[in-house]
Amino acid sequence: MFKVKILLIGPSECGKTALANFLSDTTESIGADYSPTQGVRILEFESHNLHNGNKSSSCDVELWDCAGDFKFESCWPALMKDSNGVAVVFNPDVPSHLKEIETWYSAFISSQGLLEGQCLLIAHHKPGSGADTNRPSLAPQLNKLPLIHSNLEEEPEEVRQEFNKYLGKVMRMLSESQEREEMSIIT
């Protein structure tokens, strides 16, 4: 079974921890009092029925819920080591988040040379905010990345399905990379 390391990054108070808890089926109530993540939380779980090419498979997921505070910037290289994908979470109702995610993109995605298929933008709508599901106005480099809207109050299973599609893409890329590596050894 593949093991996939996904970083969940983005501005402070955008909903990364609530999303991580939901995706990993961690039992903490949605909408609890805000408590900022210190450094990183690593959640491990199995994800099933992922579409990896023309077959369905499973993988072990390490979801790294990374702190949104820039005081932890010195830890970022250690967090990025051996990561297979990055999901950038932001609250589209907070104008500063739209600008701040450009910094997260530069630090975590372009610096690692990740491919678009290894990345995901998640416009996370907080409970009671009323979800505008239009694509927000983003910088050109961010417009190339796939975007999903997350509303855990109204459509939680849709969020899980979209995240699982993303995991399937990452797994497929890992599988193809492994096959290429094996073929280069043989030839």
From Swiss-Prot:
Tell me which GO cellular component terms the UniProt record holds: endomembrane system; intraciliary transport particle B
Query: GO molecular function: any one?
Result: GTP binding
Tell me yes or no: is Thylakoid among this UniProt entry's keywords: no
Which Pfam family, just one, is annotated for this protein? Roc
Q: What is the lineage of its organism?
A: Eukaryota, Metazoa, Chordata, Craniata, Vertebrata
**Positions bound to GTP:** 10-17, 65-69, 125-128
Q: Which UniProt keywords apply?
A: GTP-binding, Nucleotide-binding
Q: Which InterPro entries match?
A: P-loop_NTPase
Could you tell me what this protein is called? Intraflagellar transport protein 22 homolog
The gene behind this protein is: ift22
Single biological process term from Gene Ontology? intracellular protein transport
Q: Which family does it belong to?
A: Belongs to the small GTPase superfamily. Rab family.
Q: Which SUPFAM superfamilies match?
A: P-loop containing nucleoside triphosphate hydrolases (SSF52540)
Query: Between which residues do disulfide bridges form?
Result: none
Coiled-coil positions:
none
